[in-house]
Amino acid sequence: MDQNGASTEARSKRKQPPTSPSTDRPLKQIKPEVDAHTRNGVPKSPELEVVDDAHSVYSLEEPIAPVAGAVHDTAEWQKTIEGVVKSVVSIHFCQTCSFDTDPAISSEATGFVVDAEKGYILTNRHVVGAGPFIGYCIFDNHEECDVYPVYRDPVHDFGILRFDPKAIKYMSVSALQLRPDFAKVGVEIRVVGNDAGEKLSILSGVISRLDRNAPEYGEGYSDFNTNYIQAAAAASGGSSGSPVVNRDGFAVALQAGGRADGAATDYFLPLDRPLRALELVRRGEAVTRGTVQTQWILKPFDECRRLGLSTDLEKAVRTQFPKETGMLVAEVVLPQGPASTKVEEGDILIKVNGEFITQFVRLDSILDDNVGKTISVTIQRAGENLEVELDVGNLHDITPDRFVSVSGASFHDLSYQQARLYAISLKNAGVFVCEAAGSFRFADGYASGWLIQEVDNQPTPNLDTFIEVMKKIPDRKRIVIQYKHLRDLHTANTSITAVDRHWHAKIRIATRNDKTGLWDFKPIADPVPAVPQVSRRANFVKMSSNYPNAVDIVRSFVRVHVSMPIKLDGFPKMNKQGYGLVVDAEQGLVLVSRAILPYDLCDISLIIADSIFIDAKVVFMHPLQNYVIVKYDPALVNAPVKTPKFATEFIRKGDETIFFGLNQNFRPVVAKTVVTDITTVAIPASAITPRYRATNFDAITVDTNQASHSGSGVLIAEDGTVQALWLSYLGERTSHSGKDVEYHLGLATPNLLPILNEIKSGKTPKLRILNVEFQTVQMSQARVMGVSEDWIEKTEQADPERHQLFMVRKVDSGHGGDGMLEGDILLTLNGKLVTRSPDLDVMYNNEFLEAVIVRKREEKTIKVTTVATEEIETDRMVSFCGATLHRPHQAVRQQISKIHSDVYISSRARGSPAYMYGLAPTNFLTHVNNIPTPDLSTFLREVKKIGDNEYFRLKVMTFDNVPWVATMKKNEHYFPTIEYVKDDTEALGWKRIIHECEDGGAREEMAIDNEAGGDEE
């Protein structure tokens, strides 16, 4: 922070592309990465890249590697490629919400047509995803059509998409024939796909292995129980789902993954199981998938011998399969599964139903053909043969195909993928949290991966039980939740949360529909009304101190928890907590920092005396000085809450005072200290994401390190008179770390007394402000800028402590009218010399001010119009295609020179059309289909004319005045248009309106994730 509020952050002046540049693209996998430890803007732990073999790391996402040595293309290859490219499509898609192992994302990949008549495309399972999917494909001639999931394998990395062949009018669609039997060591291949996000890339290689185990990709989706094919082709991002073709033009494998360390090695999925699935889908039959809930891996004979493989058995296997070099060994056996008491880790698989088994393909085939039946399995353990009977389960039954949304979060049963990774039982494991938000946003920070064990002291072993428990819980009831994280199943966590059934009223269930390719949403429970709060008794802690009157201020502090269902105004969080100061105990008025409570579309909960929970409502928000007044019902509080005495005189530099604060651990701290400085500061503006910041105020600093660790507190005299408030001030987001800076500073109490007295009298202050941001100039600067010696002398006499004047640093845009200009030096307002921030307070109650200024070395007297603050706060927002739109808030007007439109993008949801087509926070939407949209009403009117799944044009202006045009496709199923309007007649203070789509989809509940500078969407 500096005196001028300068910030070193930089925003890209150009528009953001729909996807990241290829250098930032996550390669192979579809999840764009910004750096080595982030996934699509969400911090990712380094340990997510799991070592498969010694010193080897494999990833669905790998950095772009140098292309392997190109093989000279013969005429035969050229003819083959010409035919293949007509079957290859570029897939642009969104996984619209977090589900199982997959976060909500928007990206690109590759697929290829495998049935031109019925319209089937083969691609990867990590492209199709386990959850809701929307996407379209682009053919070689740039014709486009929508695609819908038909099948995604529960384990193996392939999925099948459906398209309408009739939609392709200008080229003959051809299909590639799947020939898994042609994949052999030494075969020359080409990978034809959307490599590194480019339209078409053709990479060459030679198959080197057919028998490597499936690579582990970490905590996300991983394939297993199959062998992979290895080749050096150096494919990268966007190549997921590419066909691997031989010289004759047959697809011999499916591109799936590769190395994360820059090596050119690639891993392909064999096509045996995709071919079987395709044939069943063609016939309209169900794709049966069997399992004994055991992961097998291929181990060479030397390792098998160490595990106890007998010589006789090795000889028998080698004789029957002379080309085999290993056998299948049990790696993970799930507890309470079909094999849990019969098969152990390290057991060598010998026979199934009397047949020697050495390959995954044959094992898969037997299991898939025996779902619901019993198979006979021979294993060898420490040299001893064992015969066991195993019941074959249905793999689809342990793969979630539904999720429930309640209180802003989403849940489903634990999946086989997660259970296999952590070797835990699928039975009664608890409910998996796939989107930890709303009432279930736990303080530990993980967005998913939680297993809910108990809710409101009732066990929740599975999703159905969880739904029944949640149906009965009233709105706003505080409940106890017990939960574990998959990473640490040893630790049971306990939290208390308030159940939100008002912002997120209905419990809704989403079920996968493989016929339509969509997920069907259905409300299953209306909210149970809240139980009225009752009066409760409590006592405050008593602190022993040398300053008993001062520490008694502890009776004036209450803990504040703010929960925001929607991100507005560029604010980076959806939950904040801190402390507030009771300013009137009789009326229940509490002062809170705007770094904790940025806007009034929220739930405010106070904890009084660390004992009583009570709800509060916003009464007043100060536009400049960083505080909010909230009100609770004092009749519900039977506790000795104290109204402090406030000083009417400004504290001065050098004065002794007592610092009383609440530190990061919410513990009170006391220290005798001295005021080191009182200066007019400028909180740095956040260039990446404009959000509320205090301006034009004098900040107090003190000589104690406790102050820097305390976000709330007071400076108080020994007799208990509060001299200043100690508040948190939200600052800039640093460009190097992406973290938000908070400053802790003091605000003298005389600044707030006039407003506080007005609120106490029952009035709501209607302030007027100057639409400018000032910075201080010293006399040396003022003289150069044209301030006369007379005024310099008057300044020095009027304020012996601070020889300074105010210069206009920035004029807020969008308010219009004549007034001060940037660079003007302010001398007087209504005849009073202005040398300190409190001298500006005359603006609060005057529509017009007479100002004496120096402009370009000329002294002038001008009439300045102040701006009413009633409309400064955001009072209306629209969620459209995943973008949160509202009028540019005050922070935007403070930073920008021209307001292009009153339709401003504040945030966007991952996996949404807004994200997919490149709309970014801080953009302005100025036209819809060439019709100007200067405000939200016009915008809503125009977008209502657009049909579902229909393309439209948006004219967009970036924050830095660069215009561009976006073409988007509307999606009402998953992203209905929802409007929130401030309405004091509503119980919540806001009215919710759903436009067009009454059922709503994955984002109807409005727990929209923000996108701010690529760090948080």
Curated annotation (Swiss-Prot):
Carries keyword Electron transport? no
The broad enzyme category this protein falls into is: hydrolase
Please tell me one Gene Ontology term that the record gives under cellular component. nucleus
- The primary location reported for this protein is nucleus
- Enzyme Commission number(s) of this protein: 3.4.21.-
Known InterPro entries for this protein? PDZ, PDZ-like_dom, PDZ_sf, Peptidase_S1_PA, Peptidase_S1C
Protein name in the entry: Pro-apoptotic serine protease NMA111
- The record lists the organism as Phaeosphaeria nodorum (strain SN15 / ATCC MYA-4574 / FGSC 10173)
